[in-house]
Amino acid sequence: MKIIRKNKKDKERREIYKQAEKMKNMYKMLRRNELLDQETRNYFNMKVTSSEKNSSISRIKNRCVETGRSRGIISAYRISRLRFREYMKMGLISGVKKISY
């Protein structure tokens, strides 16, 4: 299967976020700690603000793992609504069927 460039980029961002998350949360906690002096809190504030852009969770975009489409993603399956519909019609997704009245 062909690797989609946007999915590769998104995967890299997820890895960067995963690595930086613990340290960033620790710095955030320490900068809010009122028991520390202001200079120390400013230091931790600087550490949080100077962190890499891609280490932010807001840079992560949900994408279809097959097509790379960024809109209309069914979160539980991580595929686009178009692929979901295709797979549903073929019966590849168990427990899901088309609604009829």
Swiss-Prot record:
Places the protein is found: Mitochondrion
Transmembrane feature ranges: none
A GO BP annotation: translation
The entry's keywords: Mitochondrion, Ribonucleoprotein, Ribosomal protein
Classification via Gene3D superfamilies: 1.10.287.1480
Entry keyword annotation includes Transcription: no
InterPro entries: Ribosomal_uS14
A single GO cellular-component term on record: mitochondrial small ribosomal subunit
GO molecular function, one term: structural constituent of ribosome
Oligomer and partners: Component of the mitochondrial ribosome small subunit (28S) which comprises a 12S rRNA and about 30 distinct proteins. Interacts with LIAT1.
Family to which this protein belongs: Belongs to the universal ribosomal protein uS14 family.
Protein name per the record: Small ribosomal subunit protein uS14m
Encoding gene (name): mrps14
